């Protein structure tokens, strides 16, 4: 059975109330250099936003130019509001171009706490995040902190990200 967002959200916590505003989002995989996502429009229509990310199981790593092109083209999808963990050295990106295009498309770039974990499969996370943040500051591009929470105990834990951003 498919559930309506308001129906599900209302059972757990009010969609709005007090200082909490609950949004429904999804992380979608970028599949190719055209920026195609692995979720159909009919699913994207039911959410508030999509976070688009490159993952090795859905995207074959290309050159810096190809990886950047895939990310930038994903910005053309009206549901994409965030680019997830653009810090993985397995998928090198041109941060100058990425940040300029994200700013123009009003897409936030994620600073992912899990990328700072030494056990992460992502390569060069800390160094890449520092470079990304410097470029974002140069262009006054917003970032968003994310935890990449695949386990409930990681939700809201930004210790490494907060330390790095100080």
Regions found by a protein language model. Give the residues of each.
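His/Asp/Glu-enriched short active-site or ligand-binding loop at hydrolase and phosphoryl-transfer sites
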Residues: 108-121
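Short hydrophobic "helix-edge" motifs at membrane interfaces and signal-peptide entry regions
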Residues: 75-76, 137-140
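Short acidic/histidine-rich active-site segments
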Residues: 141-155
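A short, structure-level motif marking secondary-structure boundaries and short turns
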Residues: 56, 83-84, 116-118, 145-148
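Extended substrate/RNA-proximal surfaces in nucleic-acid metabolism proteins
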Residues: 2-111, 166
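Histidine/acidic-residue-rich catalytic or RNA/ligand-binding cores of hydrolases
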Residues: 92-101, 119-135, 152-165
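Short, active-site-adjacent cap segments at secondary-structure transitions
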Residues: 30-31, 116, 152
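C-terminal active-site rim and adjoining tail of enzyme catalytic domains
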Residues: 112-114, 133, 146
């Amino acid at each position: 059975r498919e559930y309506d967002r308001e129906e599900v959200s209302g059972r757990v916590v009010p969609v709005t109330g007090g200082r909490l505003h609950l949004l429904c989002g999804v992380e979608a995989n970028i599949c190719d250099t055209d920026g195609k996502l692995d979720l159909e429009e009919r699913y994207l229509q039911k959410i508030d936003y999509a976070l688009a990310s490159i993952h090795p199981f859905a995207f074959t790593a290309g050159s810096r130019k190809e990886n950047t092109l895939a990310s930038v083209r994903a910005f053309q999808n009206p549901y994409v509001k965030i680019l997830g963990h653009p810090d993985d050295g397995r998928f090198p990106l041109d941060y100058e171009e990425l940040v300029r295009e994200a700013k123009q498309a009003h897409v936030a770039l994620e600073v992912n706490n899990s990328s700072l974990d030494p056990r992460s499969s992502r390569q060069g996370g800390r160094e890449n995040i520092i470079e990304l943040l410097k470029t974002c500051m140069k262009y006054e591009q917003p970032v968003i902190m994310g935890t990449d929470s695949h386990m409930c105990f990681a939700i809201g834990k930004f210790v490494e990200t907060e330390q790095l951003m100080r």
